[in-house]
């Protein structure tokens, strides 16, 4: 992942088109014509070996070395067979960025993409493409693409992987008068990836929103890191194609335990704070909303129409999507009653009647939009003689400055409605073909706000903490099994693994013979269940074709020791017949759990080929189709995210509706989900783990049947909490302190820490007075992305067992891992104990270990203690005249290539 040289793609001052002619079908000719039509303000040169000196007014050169200077950007339109060689020559010439528009279709060049990538790597040039449409940056009058049209400047950045879809979006946007800050299609880009561009747009663009079209995700962690950061600053909408196996293409990817992988993408998008749209129509409607509406404050929608039928369509969709009808204030109700007396008590949706005039539409909007309980107003119009479509639209538009809330419109119909919708487009007011589409578009903004609110919530403190000893025992167990060459755990080994993480299993014995099973049955009161455990039934997510039939490897309701002994003989004989090559491990003997008013659940961890470990939850049991209620989340989980996962499921709703202790039950389930999340983070060799069923009753959660298998070390889409960075230290006054990475649950403690800082300490840290930390502040400071940030807290455990934060240090690292910026702050009453030095040394050690080249920080001139600490730690301190601060710089690692040396000398590149 890298933003290296990306500015040359989007902000070039000089540009060369390689391979262009005046022929109508010339790809390069189309690019040159677009540059001319867009009014590109920089220099353009054309490289073509033919005997031509000028094309579209631009000078043509036959040799690369003849160019007057090294261009910032090269657009390669040559045939595929020479494109890799051209890339390497451009890189050696000093060009930093190359767009490869050429497709390999029809050329049949073997290893085309690999050859392009190797050429880019050999010559230190960044390559976007092949098969990309190109780049449009209307604000800079740049159209380096083969798009058939230019686009207006706007505030939405579109980043996609399909050139043809990009063309369609341009045509649609021009028809609606909608603009873009950037329009970028990457095609099959071998070097510059989607996440690289997202990073660049987030950091360097003034775009207010990002619309993504995805076909595939080559690097899930880079992608999740980039979009998680972007969605904190901008609204990010995403549409994913290839949702079904039939549309996926080759190779087909599978996730054990899931009939369809698309829910994994939905879970990842939600976790990153994005809003997903389901189809191209919805995507276009979302664009309309993004470009023409201010951010909404909430989900309270008021609906005005000249007929109840159309407005009820909007109401149904609103409630189905989780929105709510605004409850109008008493003042607004009185105004409406005086304005239009009616016996109808329904005021939202507001039916102003089939006899309403254009002026009455305007008056209704003015009254309703002034209500403080309304977040947005939707106006639904059906054509009448008294309120013609176009005349009514023009009246609404003429008074738009008097409306106090966001306005959405749906002028229904086609013949008369079409010119009315055109007028709304010209006026920049969102308009939709149907009331349902308008509501859907409104809910995009609402869902974004909800996602952000969820991600900013402070997770409750964990009521448990797995000990280091238990985690190490679990690691040793898994390592021993993997070292033996076995790719799965036995039932007994899985029980021991879960026990290390505080997940209890029902009383279970593991007899090796029928005789031993009969003897052990004496220890269990009541009826028993018996299962045979062998290699073939030790794998998770292996289901029978008929889920309502009990497995042949399980016997239930065995009453006597003799029943158990005979049952064991029968099960072993069946195993030997059906699975003669499957090693026998043991029988699994448990008491039946009937009569405890239990609910059966299914929990587990599976591994997706793109996003890595995924946590699963839903209805469970031996005789149900558990796939119908399988919901999932991307780990690591905290209690808030676990609660969201449970709430999304049918099982969760059943608990809320039928349990007498719903909150306690939900808390217990969420704790278990967090433990599973921690387990898969601690043990990367775990490929899959399934608990089915897990029994929930009023007293306990009990795992009944479990399976677990192993694989290669997992690659997490979101970097897990770095437990290994915890360390105990002793301060000068003898007190014991733990230094550990910060986590989301620290918000309350961090707020308490902040309240004990002096105004001067706060000003030295934030460069201004900051008496309070907002909810958003706490979220940004505690729920960090460990892939690019790190924060260490020094925490002391008090005599009563409570904990408090004594100091915090943190770093923010750029996407290329070149520079990291630090900050450190210590409680005033603890300064002089060496804590600041210890926290800084922890930061320096960590940053060195991850390969960062340089640590920097800005210090107020009057902050003499910090300046002294920097000098002690070896930082070079110099006065920054422009910002009037001290810049502290510490080299951490030596650069290993020319690009890193270049970036250190040229931070903007």
Task: Annotate each language-model stretch with its function.
Residues 713-909:
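Long, contiguous binding/interaction regions
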Residues 450-479, 696-738, 893-905:
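Phosphate/pyrophosphate-recognition segments in soluble nucleotide-handling domains
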Residues 603, 691-693, 706-708, 822, ...:
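A structural signal for short, well-ordered beta-strand segments
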Residues 1-705:
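Catalytic-core regions of core metabolic enzymes
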